[in-house]
Amino acid sequence: MFMTMKQNFYHLGIACAVAILVVYRINGLAFLLTLAATIALNDASSHYILKEGITRLRPCHVLPDLEMIIRCSNSFSFPSNHASNTFAAATLMSLCFRNTTFLAIAFALLVCYSRVYLKVHYPSDILGGAIYGSLIGYLCYRHIYTRILKFIKP
Protein backbone atom coordinates (compact mmCIF):
# COMPACT_ATOMS: atom_id res chain seq x y z
CA MET A 1 0.00 0.00 0.00
CA PHE A 2 2.95 2.33 0.66
CA MET A 3 3.91 2.18 -3.03
CA THR A 4 0.50 3.33 -4.22
CA MET A 5 -0.03 6.46 -2.11
CA LYS A 6 1.25 9.69 -3.66
CA GLN A 7 1.79 11.49 -0.35
CA ASN A 8 4.46 8.94 0.60
CA PHE A 9 6.66 10.22 -2.21
CA TYR A 10 6.59 14.02 -1.88
CA HIS A 11 9.75 14.32 0.22
CA LEU A 12 11.50 11.57 -1.74
CA GLY A 13 10.54 13.28 -5.01
CA ILE A 14 11.96 16.61 -3.87
CA ALA A 15 15.17 14.95 -2.68
CA CYS A 16 15.52 13.11 -6.01
CA ALA A 17 14.93 16.31 -7.99
CA VAL A 18 17.64 18.12 -6.02
CA ALA A 19 20.02 15.18 -6.44
CA ILE A 20 19.37 15.10 -10.20
CA LEU A 21 20.11 18.82 -10.45
CA VAL A 22 23.31 18.51 -8.40
CA VAL A 23 24.64 15.44 -10.22
CA TYR A 24 23.50 16.09 -13.79
CA ARG A 25 23.25 19.94 -13.79
CA ILE A 26 22.06 21.15 -17.23
CA ASN A 27 21.00 17.66 -18.33
CA GLY A 28 19.22 17.28 -15.00
CA LEU A 29 17.32 20.53 -15.50
CA ALA A 30 16.33 19.46 -19.02
CA PHE A 31 15.21 16.09 -17.63
CA LEU A 32 13.09 17.63 -14.85
CA LEU A 33 11.39 20.06 -17.25
CA THR A 34 10.71 17.23 -19.68
CA LEU A 35 9.49 14.99 -16.86
CA ALA A 36 6.90 17.59 -15.83
CA ALA A 37 5.64 17.85 -19.41
CA THR A 38 5.71 14.07 -19.85
CA ILE A 39 3.65 13.34 -16.74
CA ALA A 40 1.16 16.12 -17.54
CA LEU A 41 0.69 14.89 -21.11
CA ASN A 42 0.60 11.22 -20.16
CA ASP A 43 -1.72 11.56 -17.18
CA ALA A 44 -4.24 13.74 -18.99
CA SER A 45 -4.32 11.71 -22.20
CA SER A 46 -4.38 8.37 -20.39
CA HIS A 47 -7.27 9.42 -18.17
CA TYR A 48 -9.41 11.69 -20.33
CA ILE A 49 -8.93 9.96 -23.67
CA LEU A 50 -8.18 6.29 -22.97
CA LYS A 51 -9.99 5.63 -19.67
CA GLU A 52 -13.02 7.70 -20.56
CA GLY A 53 -13.10 6.21 -24.08
CA ILE A 54 -12.66 2.56 -23.14
CA THR A 55 -14.74 2.64 -19.90
CA ARG A 56 -13.59 -0.69 -18.49
CA LEU A 57 -14.89 -1.29 -14.97
CA ARG A 58 -12.48 -2.02 -12.14
CA PRO A 59 -12.34 -5.49 -10.56
CA CYS A 60 -14.07 -4.17 -7.43
CA HIS A 61 -17.06 -3.05 -9.53
CA VAL A 62 -17.33 -6.31 -11.46
CA LEU A 63 -16.74 -8.55 -8.42
CA PRO A 64 -18.65 -6.85 -5.57
CA ASP A 65 -17.70 -9.54 -3.01
CA LEU A 66 -14.00 -8.91 -3.57
CA GLU A 67 -12.32 -8.11 -0.26
CA MET A 68 -10.63 -4.75 -0.78
CA ILE A 69 -7.48 -3.53 0.93
CA ILE A 70 -8.09 0.09 -0.06
CA ARG A 71 -11.18 2.01 -1.18
CA CYS A 72 -12.38 1.21 -4.68
CA SER A 73 -12.01 4.16 -7.05
CA ASN A 74 -14.94 5.46 -9.07
CA SER A 75 -12.81 5.99 -12.19
CA PHE A 76 -12.45 3.42 -14.94
CA SER A 77 -9.76 0.77 -14.96
CA PHE A 78 -8.00 0.65 -18.35
CA PRO A 79 -5.26 1.73 -18.58
CA SER A 80 -3.72 2.07 -15.14
CA ASN A 81 -2.53 5.67 -14.73
CA HIS A 82 -0.08 4.56 -12.02
CA ALA A 83 1.50 2.14 -14.51
CA SER A 84 1.36 4.66 -17.33
CA ASN A 85 2.93 7.50 -15.33
CA THR A 86 5.66 5.41 -13.72
CA PHE A 87 6.64 3.81 -17.03
CA ALA A 88 6.61 7.19 -18.79
CA ALA A 89 8.98 8.52 -16.11
CA ALA A 90 11.12 5.35 -16.08
CA THR A 91 11.46 5.35 -19.87
CA LEU A 92 12.38 9.02 -19.96
CA MET A 93 14.88 8.62 -17.13
CA SER A 94 16.44 5.55 -18.75
CA LEU A 95 16.91 7.39 -22.03
CA CYS A 96 18.32 10.53 -20.40
CA PHE A 97 20.60 8.76 -17.91
CA ARG A 98 21.52 5.26 -19.07
CA ASN A 99 22.98 4.28 -15.68
CA THR A 100 19.53 4.61 -14.02
CA THR A 101 17.67 2.08 -16.16
CA PHE A 102 17.57 -0.80 -13.67
CA LEU A 103 16.45 1.35 -10.75
CA ALA A 104 13.83 3.24 -12.79
CA ILE A 105 12.28 0.10 -14.27
CA ALA A 106 12.39 -1.74 -10.92
CA PHE A 107 10.51 1.13 -9.25
CA ALA A 108 7.90 1.20 -12.04
CA LEU A 109 7.39 -2.57 -11.78
CA LEU A 110 6.98 -2.33 -8.01
CA VAL A 111 4.28 0.33 -8.38
CA CYS A 112 2.56 -1.80 -11.05
CA TYR A 113 2.61 -4.89 -8.85
CA SER A 114 1.01 -2.92 -6.02
CA ARG A 115 -1.98 -2.02 -8.24
CA VAL A 116 -2.77 -5.69 -8.94
CA TYR A 117 -2.04 -6.71 -5.34
CA LEU A 118 -4.48 -4.07 -4.08
CA LYS A 119 -7.09 -5.46 -6.52
CA VAL A 120 -7.78 -2.11 -8.18
CA HIS A 121 -6.55 -3.21 -11.64
CA TYR A 122 -6.45 -6.24 -13.86
CA PRO A 123 -3.00 -7.29 -15.14
CA SER A 124 -4.03 -6.15 -18.64
CA ASP A 125 -4.70 -2.64 -17.26
CA ILE A 126 -1.12 -2.61 -16.02
CA LEU A 127 0.30 -3.91 -19.29
CA GLY A 128 -1.68 -1.36 -21.31
CA GLY A 129 -0.59 1.46 -19.02
CA ALA A 130 3.06 0.36 -19.13
CA ILE A 131 3.07 0.22 -22.93
CA TYR A 132 1.30 3.57 -23.32
CA GLY A 133 3.50 5.26 -20.72
CA SER A 134 6.67 3.90 -22.31
CA LEU A 135 5.57 5.26 -25.68
CA ILE A 136 4.83 8.70 -24.24
CA GLY A 137 8.15 8.69 -22.35
CA TYR A 138 10.04 7.85 -25.54
CA LEU A 139 8.21 10.48 -27.62
CA CYS A 140 8.80 13.16 -24.99
CA TYR A 141 12.49 12.25 -24.90
CA ARG A 142 12.76 12.54 -28.69
CA HIS A 143 10.71 15.70 -29.12
CA ILE A 144 10.94 17.66 -25.85
CA TYR A 145 14.13 16.71 -23.99
CA THR A 146 16.38 17.09 -27.03
CA ARG A 147 14.88 20.51 -27.83
CA ILE A 148 15.23 21.73 -24.25
CA LEU A 149 18.87 20.62 -24.23
CA LYS A 150 19.56 22.53 -27.46
CA PHE A 151 17.89 25.60 -25.98
CA ILE A 152 19.64 25.67 -22.58
CA LYS A 153 23.07 24.28 -23.45
CA PRO A 154 25.51 26.95 -24.65
Labelled PLM ranges:
Residues 2-9, 25-26, 86, 96-99:
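Membrane-interface junctions
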Residues 41, 45-50, 136-144:
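Alpha-helical membrane-inserting segments
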Residues 17-44:
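Interfacial segments of alpha-helical transmembrane regions
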Residues 67-154:
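Membrane-embedded catalytic cores of phosphoryl/pyrophosphoryl-handling enzymes
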